[in-house]
Amino acid sequence: MTNRPKLIVTAVALLAMSASLAQSERSDVEDPNEALKIAALEALISAPPERALPLVIKVLDANNTDEVKERALFVLSQIDLPEAQARLLEVARSSDPELSAEAVRMIGIGGNPEALAGLGELYSEGDEDLREAVLEAYMIAGDVDAVHAIATNASDADEFGAAVEMLGVMGAVDRLQALSETSGFTEELIQALGIAGGDNVNATLMTIYRDAETDDIRHAALEGMLISGYDEGVLELYKESTDVNEKRDLLQMLAIMDSDAMMEVIDAALEGGDQ
């Protein structure tokens, strides 16, 4: 009897590989032999795992181009065998920075819990590029806990900023709120909230702006509204402000946001009144 869920997953993976291959053929892959190898790898996605694995490993061990090996890593990420996940981690720990980062991302695509757990050590020992790849892998896999842990244990502002930005991309508003309870609403956290967006976030950004004790935090709240597209909030702040300089800044933000209300506000400002 056909395993329908597995068949669907295989079909989706095959379509993803086909799209990637099509892009490759339009740009990087000029050697017909290389294109044929990539096509052969694509076909392996639908092969039995125990038969596909040794062939993929053979490609990785041979003197192939990075393009071919990257395709092999993708196929490897789709093979649900412990040996495949172990090999992905092995490549991720290799000295080749490009293949290492690609292997990390493929671990994210594969979503294997054991392989994902192995990324923690890689993150701790890796350079900035590898750490970025690990964060991307966690994002692809939807591993909010891992990204939150990185933000919590960050050793500097840059590391913290990268982690909270990824939490914003993942829409993890609750984790961002939790971080604010220990670190306060930093500029990085505020901008990450803007990336996450949503009605609750917009209300939080308004509160942060109104309660801000520094211009930097106030500006970060505005940037958060810009990122989330909350021009209604900026317009509300403009209408309630009595400070000319503040109104000017808010008007400029409305212009940047290309708000529908901008022309009405400009007309009122030129008339010397408020809207």
How should each PLM-predicted stretch be described?
Residues 36-49:
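Alpha-helical segment of the N-proximal tetratricopeptide repeat
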Residues 23-28, 49-61, 70, 81-93, ...:
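Amphipathic alpha-helical scaffolding segments comprising HEAT/armadillo-like alpha-solenoid repeats
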Residues 2-9:
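Bacterial N-terminal signal peptides that target proteins for export
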Residues 35-37, 67-69, 98-100, 129-131, ...:
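Positions within the helices of HEAT/ARM-like alpha-solenoid repeats
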Residues 10-18:
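Bacterial N-terminal signal peptides
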